[in-house]
Amino acid sequence: MEYSDDGRFDVIVVGAGVMGSSAAYQLAKRGQKTLLLEQFDFLHHRGSSHGESRTIRATYPEDYYYSMVSESTRLWAAAQSEIGYKVHFPTQQFDMGPADQQSLLSVVATCQKHGLAHRVMDSHAVSEHFSGRISIPENWIGVSTELGGIIKPTKAVSMFQTLAIGHGAILRDNTKVANIKRDGESGEGVIVCTVKGDKFYGKKCIVTAGAWISKLVKTVAGIDFPVEPLETTVCYWRIKEGHEEKFTIDGEFPTFASYGAPYVYGTPSLEYPGLIKVAVHGGYWCDPDKRPWGPGVKLEELKEWIKERFGGMVDSEGPVATQLCMYSMTPDEDFVIDFLGGEFGRDVVVGGGFSGHGFKMAPAVGRILADMAMEVEAGGGGVEMKQFSLRRFEDNPKGNAKEYPDQVILDVPLKH
């Protein structure tokens, strides 16, 4: 099927995870004739935008993420107001680690620079602050901030898609894109070709294909896109009887991150009563079309971490439930948000490599992608776009230089 001149779109978005859905919403809201394509069913569980919880935090060692988190917090609230239900559930954010851990000290510096209210605590103050629910070693510190919380991922993606439809966007799932070509007849814009032979015409195109973005960009432009998929395992642990309410979001338990080896993160009990999410930021490299489907998780260090951190109130014998997800990793764990360039110039925008920490910033990323497709200055809100350039890997394969080696925190075995 061909969609002829009268069916042209202003922007075609390829990939309906949280980033593509957020971008489609932004575009449609601004009056752009928008098409959002997804290769699988909408709200599928084969990528990176599903599940029951993601954290939101502003405590980054990299200062340039603060403005994106701050903007996203406002945009999450605006989208919730428009849709009429909640996907963001605020709570404290608590970061912890060795007192000499440079990345954790950079988190404190970020808070100070931006006036983000925070409290730095020693082990005794941490125990008092959380009434014994969290314990840290004597040589550790903890940093508590109010800008934290949980995002409901599947619900959030559905929200953006519903809002996009409400503003006139067209959504099609089970529509896998095979290639993107220049529109030779009109001399401008692109043709998006599907594996079924359909052709969609657009003035602009945004590619947010998640773990599949490297494969698609290689086909489209013949370049090696610096993003590689990784399969990770999310673990849920049972809270011991009588202590369940102490670890709930209503009980003011925080979202949290533990710096060092391993880098551990988690959320309070919300989606599964009586269970708390605690996982390692890591996993195993994979082909998104030939995944091992787990389990692939290192449990011994995580068991020990849980045993030492939660005052014996969480069963550390092993997780009672697990879920699989994919990260789309860049070498420096920073995003790629840029024009594809080459023959496509500024007509194709790419957004990928969100490296296991991008979901919280989806509203700002969607706004930026929409700005770029509409040729509006994308650096609004103080966002430093140079950090996300595709070209940064040309001079240095490792990408952005990090001030401290431990800022690239991924725990993953070397590829063979």
Curated annotation (Swiss-Prot):
It catalyses: sarcosine + O2 + H2O = formaldehyde + glycine + H2O2. FAD binds at residues 10-40. The keyword Flavoprotein applies. One of its GO terms (molecular function) is flavin adenine dinucleotide binding. The keyword Lipid metabolism does not apply. InterPro entries: FAD-dep_OxRdtase (IPR006076), FAD/NAD-bd_sf (IPR036188), MTOX (IPR045170). Its EC number is 1.5.3.1. Keywords: FAD, Flavoprotein, Oxidoreductase. Its cofactor is FAD. SUPFAM superfamilies: FAD-linked reductases, C-terminal domain, FAD/NAD(P)-binding domain. The modification S-8alpha-FAD cysteine is found at C325. Binds 1 FAD per subunit. Belongs to the MSOX/MTOX family. This is Probable sarcosine oxidase. It comes from Arabidopsis thaliana.
